[in-house]
Amino acid sequence: MNILDFVMVGSDDHEKSGDFYDAVFEPLKLTRVLKTQKYLGYAHSSDPEKVQFYVTHPVNGKDATFGNGTQITLLADNKEAVEKFYEIAISKGATDEGAPGVRKDGNYYGYIRDLDLSLIHISEPTRPY
């Protein structure tokens, strides 16, 4: 059983973040299904009623910041989707934190920081360690 209900990241600029995530989520089959003044919501095409990823203004009214030591791992269907996500992210202003490739554990993944510096790990289905 998957224990995660959804992921939420903070942003001070929903227009820029929406443009970024609209583009990078396309290879993962996630689309924006909600937009309010407070947040954007993204769902997978297989279950468009279930929002899995939110972009929000912080509820405390302070500036959005990234979490030091925090990482969000997203699962792609295959290597091609990992590469496409990474390429789109970089073209939309993300920071490279490790290009896609086979790692020491034998798995294929890469890392970017989004426009608000949240660390995103994009991976194909992994093998056990």
Model segments located where?
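Single conserved hydrophobic/aromatic residue that forms the stacking wall/gate
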Residues: 120-129
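Long, continuous compositionally biased terminal/linker segments
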Residues: 44-77, 81-84
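A short, surface-exposed helix-loop junction/capping segment
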Residues: 1-5
